[in-house]
UniProtKB/Swiss-Prot annotation:
GO terms for biological process: translation. GO terms for molecular function: structural constituent of ribosome. This is Large ribosomal subunit protein bL28. NCBIfam families: L28. It comes from Aeromonas salmonicida (strain A449). Transmembrane segments: none annotated. Belongs to the bacterial ribosomal protein bL28 family. It comes from the Bacteria. Pfam families: Ribosomal_L28 (PF00830). Gene3D superfamilies: Ribosomal protein L28/L24. GO terms for cellular component: cytosolic large ribosomal subunit. Residues 1-24 are annotated as: Disordered. Keywords: Ribonucleoprotein, Ribosomal protein.
């Protein structure tokens, strides 16, 4: 399963670790993803989404049914 938020599209980013001597080594910054079940009142069922913390805030603000409608319109099977 890829490390991509289904709501925001956040993906791993690439950057550098920096030591005290300022040596650079490559690293990945991973998004804060969680598999979370959301209750969809209109469908009377739970829907599992892999979302970041920011994605959960978006769902809290706009509502799960609005976000699901946008996901389905973009071709995501939910």
């Amino acid at each position: 399963m890829s490390r991509v938020c289904q709501v925001t599209g956040k993906r791993p980013a690439v950057g550098n670790n920096r030591s005290h001597a300022n040596n650079a080594t490559k690293r990945r910054f991973l998004p804060n993803l969680h598999t979370h079940r959301f209750w969809v009142e209109g469908e009377k069922r739970f829907v599992s989404l892999r979302v970041s913390a920011k994605g959960m805030r978006i769902i809290d603000k706009r509502g799960v049914e609005v976000v699901l409608a946008e996901l389905r319109a973009s071709g995501v099977k939910v």
